[in-house]
Each structure stands twice: as C-alpha cells, then as structure tokens.
Amino acid sequence: MSKVVVVYHSGYGHTQRVAQQVAEGAAAQLIAIDAEGNLGEADWAALAEADAIIFGTPTYMGGASWQFKKFADASSKAWFTRAWQDKVFGGFTNSASPVGDKGATMIGLQTLASQHGGIWVSLGQLPSNSKAAT
C-alpha cells in the first residue's frame, strides 16, 4: 500500500478541516505545520518515507501562508539529497474570498513539487464554463 502524507498549515481552522477530509479520503498521515512554520524531526522523516505528499495552505494575499512558505524553504534540505525525487504530489488551498487568487497559490504548490523533482497530479477537471465540464 502506498504511504501518503498530507502536510498543511491552517490559520483559522478552515484548511485544517479540508486537510482532515483529504487525509481521510486518501488514508493518509496528517502533519500540521505549527504556528511558527515548523515541523518536528519525525514529521520530516515521514515526508521522506512517503510515496505521495499532498500540500495544503490557506491563500492569503494571493499566496501561501508565511508558515507554509517557511516549511517550503526548509524543504531545501530534502532538495539537496533529492529525498522527494519522483514522489507523487498534489495540493489544495482555500480563502475567504470567492476568487482570492487561489490559482496563484496552487501554481506555487506545483512549482514546489517540481523543484523537488516530483510528479504533480491535478484533478483533471475542465473549466466550469465548458459544456464538457457539466
């Protein structure tokens, strides 16, 4: 069985609720980035051992939370050893705004996965204005 980890930051609890549902659906281990943007050593080890990593962050001002960005920067240690090379990645975000530039956050998550040599998996959904999407 594949080992999946959901790593997320939640500022007000909304992203945590989504992360819990994603983890339940994927039978994944749930790892929360703390309020200072840190993870414990056991959490980093779990990420290294995972077959798939799912990122989660709220979108604030058109990007990921600073705590998630701190985690992303700290992941450079894994980058140097290519610890996440060829892992499968996905991600999610939310914001209080109907638009809120969540797309920019998702591109950032995809870029982070690509920096690590990962394989990004999208939802495969067509734009909602397409007749094929209904």
Residue ranges of model-derived segments:
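N-terminal beta1-alpha1-beta2 submodule of the flavodoxin-like/Rossmannoid cofactor-binding fold
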Residues: M1-W84
